[in-house]
Amino acid sequence: MKSYGFDGNAPQGLGRKVTSVYVYEAPVRLWHWVTVLCIITLSVTGYLIGKPLPSVPGEATFNFVMGYIRFAHFTAGYILAIGLIGRLYWALVGNHHAREIILVPIWDKGWWKEFFFEVRWYMFIERYPKKYIGHNPVGQIAMATFLWAAVFMCFSGFALYGEGLGTKSWAYQAFGWVISAFGGNSLTVHNWHRLGMWSIILFVMIHVYAAIREDIMSKQSMVSTMISGFRMFKD
């Protein structure tokens, strides 16, 4: 089933106006909000790991703040990675909308037509919005890019984690090749990892803006949809 933009105010079904459609299943919504918490935790702790707090003299047992920060970062990284695996699994067994950000139909001319329409809409060139049950094409591209960025962050993060644990650790054995791919310089991996953090922070800012904007201007629910699972058409 294609869920490209609908003409008119809201989609029609069985001869009557549809005001709500169940879109996002519980696992997708859970993944979304768990990922939100992970990104917040990883961004704050990652920044502090890159720019540590001033050293405090005294017994390490009572001044273990950076240790707790690193532990929170590593824990959130594990959760993010497990969540990504679960999200990919649900793309295989979930409904059509669970696959939208995994398999983007860039081979479809109709999809590109909708994509450029949405670009014009976001640039305030188009006067009236279209309705989408799931993600619009711009949203699909954005979320697919985020997924690949998150995968890169997990790979590079576990590579750096493995270097700290030692060459015999599972993390280094599984992801040590990432450092080799960057010329064997872990500082280069660290710099790209940090750039990835700022890129994801920028993505989050745009994502939140776009969701609130669409909620108001396109007259279809966005934020509440990721809570209830239902897309509401308001006109």
Task: Name every feature range the model reports, one short phrase each.
Residues 1-235:
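Membrane-embedded alpha-helical bundles that constitute the cytochrome b-like, heme-associated redox core
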